[in-house]
Amino acid sequence: IKIVVERDPIKTSFEKWAKPGHFSKTLAKGPNTTTWIWNLHADAHDFDSHTNDLEEISRKVFSAHFGQLAIIFIWLSGMYFHGARFSNYEAWLGDPTHIKPSAQVVWPIVGQEILNGDVGGGFRGIQITSGFFQIWRASGITSELQLYCTAIGALIFAALMLFAGWFHYHKAAPKLAWFQDVESMLNHHLAGLLGLGSLSWAGHQIHVSLPINELLDAGVDPKEIPLPHEFILNRELLAQLYPSFAKGLTPFFTLNWSEYSEFLTFRGGLNPVTGGLWLTDTAHHHLAIAILFLIAGHMYRTNWSIGHNLKEILEAHKGPFTGEGHRGLYEILTTSWHAQLALNLAMLGSLTIVVAHHMYSMPPYPYLATDYGTQLSLFTHHMWIGGFLIVGAAAHAAIFMVRDYDPTTQYNNLLDRVLRHRDAIVSHLNWACIFLGFHSFGLYIHNDTMSALGRPKDMFSDTAIQLQPIFAQWIQNTHALAPSLTAPDATASTSLTWGGGDLVAVGAKVALLPIPLGTADFLVHHIHAFTIHVTVLILLKGVLFARSSRLIPDKVNLGFRFPCDGPGRGGTCQVSAWDHVFLGLFWMYNAISVVIFHFSWKMQSDVWGSISDQGVVTHITGGNFAQSSITINGWLRDFLWAQASQVIQSYGSSLSAYGLLFLGAHFVWAFSLMFLFSGRGYWQELIESIVWAHNKLKVAPAIQPRALSIVQGRAVGVAH
């Protein structure tokens, strides 16, 4: 056994906590000017700047992860505690179609109690849109007591995480070799976290969630349903609902697995009672995922001479046109955590955006699809998180290029080849952006002009000149028809959005129906393509030119963030890798705004709405998307103004909080422009006048005030 920890490397002491800036020689001296506090914040978690010792940096990052997990558990505990203490969860569980979820009651201070709207069932509070109630029901929570217990459990886990963070930094800190043992890490993460994690969740779903939800769907009072541990301990209870449970594990070991198809199903579509995915489908899914990951977690070579070796795989990975291929990348990914993080963020960010799209097209929890506010919030939330992670990927890729890239070890491999033809990449991408920008915007301008001239027959629309998204429609159609060939026992396709005419409504509200795509979607999809390509252009240019450019050949010496290349070199401001991340963030915001607008209007126009006894669907905005969203004027008038006016005029009602937030958000946005539009010199002059006045009155501060640096000002601006 290899000993891969060091015992008692750093003694535990609170002394450093009393010395702000202890991690930096310069900052530890204390403040001379007000810039000190900004540098303190900028560098406190920049472990690279504290030491060059990769082992020490790795330990700090590892330890910080436990701190992060502790915070997450505390936050989660708070959510569950609110559900237990301040919510109408039990009432909602009894009647989820008429009662809205609420877990916050505003205290009557200076009239704020106006925010407590009537959410049904005699409960007054703020309606929540986080989806927690739906998750709780799906996992089989039937009482507020269970929420209390889970909240306490989360706090215990938080304490464990805090202890682990301390222990693995101060008592038993891993050696560098442990952090670099990628095969062992892959085996443990794949088999342990993802494999056993999915397996335990599948077990919970089968033994606890499924029976409880089966009874809830049948209309049994939550108070009459047996408690979770009773289902686990008493097999008879489960056998009443799923007779094959009486046979135990015999069918498993005799390979007669179809016996289990009562609770491990492959139905497709949605449960008509709840409007969510069949929970028997999701249990089956998690079991299958668990098997895959448990196998994957045994594929990498560690102590025995079988299995994959990452270094060998990467070095063998050469194509006919790619030079040395992946040679040298193994060394990068085991010595630069920025490079590793960049890849992980890019993948996790993309995955998060995929999750955003699955939350509405395959709503995973009961009664989620008919809770429109929550659907909108979850989509927005996952799109934003995904956007931040992808921009973060570019940021850390650029930091890797500046701090960790060693050109002498990377010759003619893929990274080197990409860097050598970066001009071709960036100029082609730039051309793509110009093309997409002019053409997508041009289609709208054309429509606005024709509309203004009263020539509807000359517009691009479903009723005039059609630009149908034929490829998207083909994909939809293929997926709608696929199950009949690939899964003959399935009753529906993976998602109702593909087509096929099915409609699921719960409590006279539409849960989901086939989403039609037309000219309007074709137009806005090209705006999506445009904004995404511009974001990529800015971020990729920042990474590829992080070390050098024709303008500043020695850029790497200036670091990741710098305002300009010194005095006497005009036109070299705002070229640092940091500035590219800054600009990329703005375009990420642009891109996501259009996505959220598109989703919000499309769903209200073509999916969400009420259904009459005769089966007639009335959509929230009456299906106006196809004809209104094809002009810029239509977006402004029929979406932005039509939706915002209700919020703006909300004062005096329980919605007023949203009106104030709306106003406040625009105030914050305007505040950000103050930092972005004014120059540093302006503020420095102003400060010096004010300091002069203080000197006159002999109240001058010991710490000299200074204007924000250019980079700091832009950081404050983009944050707001």
UniProtKB/Swiss-Prot annotation:
Chlorophyll a binds at M674, Y682. It is a multi-pass membrane protein. Chlorophyll a' binds at H666. GO terms for cellular component: chloroplast thylakoid membrane; photosystem I. SUPFAM superfamilies: Photosystem I subunits PsaA/PsaB. It is an enzyme of class 1 (oxidoreductase). It is found in: Plastid, Chloroplast thylakoid membrane. It comes from the Eukaryota. Phylloquinone binds at W683. Its main location: plastid. Keywords: 4Fe-4S, Chlorophyll, Chloroplast, Chromophore, Electron transport, Iron, Iron-sulfur, Magnesium, Membrane, Metal-binding, Oxidoreductase, Photosynthesis, Photosystem I, Plastid, Thylakoid, Transmembrane, Transmembrane helix, Transport. Its EC number is 1.97.1.12. The chain crosses the membrane at residues 61-84, 147-170, 186-210, 282-300, 337-360, 376-402, 424-446, 522-540, 580-601, 655-677, 715-720. P700 is a chlorophyll a/chlorophyll a' dimer, A0 is one or more chlorophyll a, A1 is one or both phylloquinones and FX is a shared 4Fe-4S iron-sulfur center. [4Fe-4S] cluster binds at C564, C573. It catalyses: reduced [plastocyanin] + hnu + oxidized [2Fe-2S]-[ferredoxin] = oxidized [plastocyanin] + reduced [2Fe-2S]-[ferredoxin]. Gene3D superfamilies: Photosystem I PsaA/PsaB. Pfam families: PsaA_PsaB (PF00223). Belongs to the PsaA/PsaB family. The PsaA/B heterodimer binds the P700 chlorophyll special pair and subsequent electron acceptors. PSI consists of a core antenna complex that captures photons, and an electron transfer chain that converts photonic excitation into a charge separation. The eukaryotic PSI reaction center is composed of at least 11 subunits. PsaA and PsaB bind P700, the primary electron donor of photosystem I (PSI), as well as the electron acceptors A0, A1 and FX. PSI is a plastocyanin-ferredoxin oxidoreductase, converting photonic excitation into a charge separation, which transfers an electron from the donor P700 chlorophyll pair to the spectroscopically characterized acceptors A0, A1, FX, FA and FB in turn. Oxidized P700 is reduced on the lumenal side of the thylakoid membrane by plastocyanin. This is Photosystem I P700 chlorophyll a apoprotein A1. It comes from Sequoia sempervirens (California redwood).
